[in-house]
Amino acid sequence: MAGLHATLHQALRGGYLRLTGIGGADLAPAHDSTHPCTMYSRCLRTLILLILLYLLGACVSTRVRVAEHVAGSRSLGAGSSVVLIEPDVELYSLMPSGLTELRADWTEQARTHLDRELRQRLAARGAGVLTLSELSEAEDRAARRQIELLYQALANSILNAELAPELLPTKRDRFDWTLGPGVSALRAPDQARYALFVLVRDSYASAGRKALMVLGPLLGVGASGGTQIGVASLVDLRNGKVIWFNLLVAQRGDLREAETARVAIDSLLQGLPL
């Protein structure tokens, strides 16, 4: 237990150099900012830390944060248009070694289910749902991609502030985050008011991993199964402020199936002020 505690704090302060997906990581300080996987690694670093937190006994299911000016609001801008950013989803197979393999077929299944459920939930709340592909072709695609990458980095910072507030003391007692005014590029042509960003990572134990989970204790080896982690944020496109944020951590739920994907979205959208 103490060893895991030390690993958690070392990882928070030093960062990861390489990630192998959910369940596998090389805990070494990240120095090469030019490495092609560096930005990806930084954005997913905290997701790996959440697994460590779970192992430390943190019973986390969802963690909702709302900006002060909307706290307590049950319906914020009802009927407003929301740009649904394509869900950033990756599903992995967890090997006996603890390494993971990205599964494109599983990922596509999950993305389809999650996208459909998100659209239905937003529509049920009276929101007009837009996607980037439906926006004007005159929009700068490269600029929009930069906004998506900026959000990934911001989400990572929010998670760090929530899980280790001593690292960002100015954010300890207030939820005040922004993507900046550049995010307004997502508003045209219909002047959408909000954007919803969703990031999900999930892993599933392979047959070999399941066997190790059963036989491992007899050999003095501990092995865990997969972990589902999701992050969702609602951003005000008029000023770039993050007005709602939710973190989901679960040990169960197969996103490859429509019904369990529906349950995951219900949890992920908990407290959404729309």
Stretch-by-stretch model annotation:
Residues 97-201, 244-247:
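N-terminal segment of the mature soluble domain
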Residues 18-19, 54:
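Repetitive helical segments and hydrophobic/amphipathic motifs
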Residues 34-59:
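Sec-dependent bacterial lipoprotein signal peptides
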Residues 3, 14-15, 21-24:
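Residue-identity detector for glycine
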Residues 60-94, 113-114, 174-194, 199-274:
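C-terminal/domain-edge helix-coil "capping" segments
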Residues 13, 18, 42-45:
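Basic polycationic patches enriched in arginine
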